[in-house]
Regions:
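A short helix-loop-beta-strand connector motif used in the catalytic cores of GNAT acetyltransferases and
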Residues: 71, 81-97, 127, 185
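Glycine-rich phosphate/pyrophosphate-binding loop shared by adenosine-nucleotide-utilizing enzymes
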Residues: 44, 103-109, 126
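Conserved acetyl-CoA-binding loop-helix of GNAT-fold acetyltransferases
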Residues: 130-133, 139-152, 176
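Conserved beta-strand in the GNAT
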Residues: 95-99, 105-114, 132
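Conserved beta-strand-loop-alpha-helix junction that forms the acyl-donor binding cleft
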Residues: 163-172, 180, 187-190
Length: 190
């Protein structure tokens, strides 16, 4: 894996690629249209992750969240297809991205995955993960729009709850998104 460069989004004017010209990880119609209406005034667009988004800076945006090594385009695409294929099984991964219409580069990303359970009469729980907004775009409400999209995807899929883990510093933000503190997260890294 190559280390990720922390360069800002490309500022050249590449033509915006419409959803219909992309191989998306799930149907774009599942994302509420009102979110794109809100983003349009800022020349931004929300959609599912596309098979070509490695080249649009997906790893760069994730690097604004945590340390990320770039696996290279081939390995990235293999993971894309693995996750997109999961959307035909009980476990589903919905990865949303926000794209600049000026540059056709990603500026934010987030994931919700659906976990089938034996609890609650074979219910499903949604887990929100990897909310990342490019450092140059933070403070503009993009994280809140991602959380709204991912929560809606979870609810439309029938999840009985949607949960996420966050640092104490981010609790006020997630409370604004309608989430409450429940329990305590434990982790063991290998």
């Amino acid at each position: 894996m190559r280390p990720c460069s922390f360069s800002p989004p490309i500022s050249s004017t590449m033509p915006f690629t419409p959803d219909s010209d992309l191989e998306l990880s799930f149907p774009a119609e599942l994302i509420p249209t009102d979110l794109n209406n809100r983003l349009a005034q800022h020349n931004l667009h929300i959609r599912p992750l596309a098979s070509s988004d490695h080249g649009r800076g997906h790893i760069r945006v994730l690097a604004s969240l945590t340390s990320v090594a770039d696996p290279g385009e081939k390995a990235w695409r293999e993971r894309f297809y693995e996750l997109a294929k999961s959307n035909t099984s009980a476990s589903k991964y919905y990865i949303c991205v926000i794209v600049s219409k000026e540059t056709d580069e990603l500026v934010a990303t987030g994931t919700v995955f659906l976990e089938p359970k034996f609890l609650r009469s074979l219910a499903t729980a949604g887990h929100i993960e990897d909310i990342a907004v490019d450092t140059s775009m933070q403070g503009r409400g993009l994280g809140k729009i991602l959380i709204s999209a991912l929560t809606t995807l979870s609810e439309k899929a029938g999840a009985y709850k949607t949960l996420l883990d966050c640092s104490d510093d981010n609790v006020p933000f997630y409370k604004k998104c309608g989430y409450d503190v429940k329990g305590l997260q434990m982790s063991k890294y290998t």
